[in-house]
Amino acid sequence: PTEETSQEPLVDIQPQEPEAPPEPTPEELAAQEVEDLLASLTLEEKVGQLFFVRVPDTDAVSDVSTYHLGGYILFGRDTADKTADALIQTIQSYQDAAAVDTGIPLLIGVDEEGGTVVRVSSNPHLRASKFPSPQKAYASGGMEAVLADTREKDFLLSALGFNVNLSPVADVSTNPADFMYDRTFGQDAAATADYVAQVVSQMAEDGMGSVLKHFPGYGNNVDTHTGIAVDQRPLESF
């Protein structure tokens, strides 16, 4: 007799290649870059990065690396009588010092609110006329005019090397007698909040950093540059 042997069909099992990990997203790559950069800094360098200071009268370039500064704020004395090329070169010299020191670009800020506080457009070499106050811009064409004015500021400041405008003023004032009134939107809290939100969004779109001021709010208080203010408003009103 013949024995028949039944066999299971052969199965060809190939080793499977392990799945490649997913490519990191741009956000993940950026986060890792930040972590690596942070890990490379000394404690002293990390502390220096917390300081966003006024440009000193002397040693402005060397101070960037001496103190590992996070940023410089330019005031009227730093922009007065300078041509655009001269100001660009000055700001670039600060950035060059930061690049050699920590490799982290500086925040370069200025107060260019429009109206009474115009550290850049007050110099006729940098702009033919001063930027208008928020109230004047609004009176000339509503929020459309305000946002057009914001864009023009952002483009001018960016071209000169600034990346932060210490603006907009978020204080609420409806009384022309208030110290802060001329620098504010001049309307109630709801209208001011809407104005601030739209301006900040426009600045972000233009790549310009914004700073809301003044905390916790001037209201109708006196000028704290020259004295001490005591706010007498009840908490509910505040």
Regions found by a protein language model. Give the residues of each.
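Metal-dependent enolase-superfamily TIM-barrel catalytic cores that perform enediolate-based chemistry
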Residues: 195-198, 202-206, 212
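Glycine-rich anion/phosphate-binding loop at the beta-strand->alpha-helix junction
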Residues: 238
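DNA-contacting surface of Y-family translesion DNA polymerases
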Residues: 25-89, 118
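N-terminal, intrinsically disordered, polar/charged segments of Gram-positive cell-envelope systems
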Residues: 2-36
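Enzymes and membrane/adaptor proteins characterized by extended Gly/Ser/Thr/Asp/Glu-rich
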Residues: 63-192, 214, 219-235
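Short coil/turn connectors at secondary-structure junctions
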Residues: 47-48, 102-105, 206-208
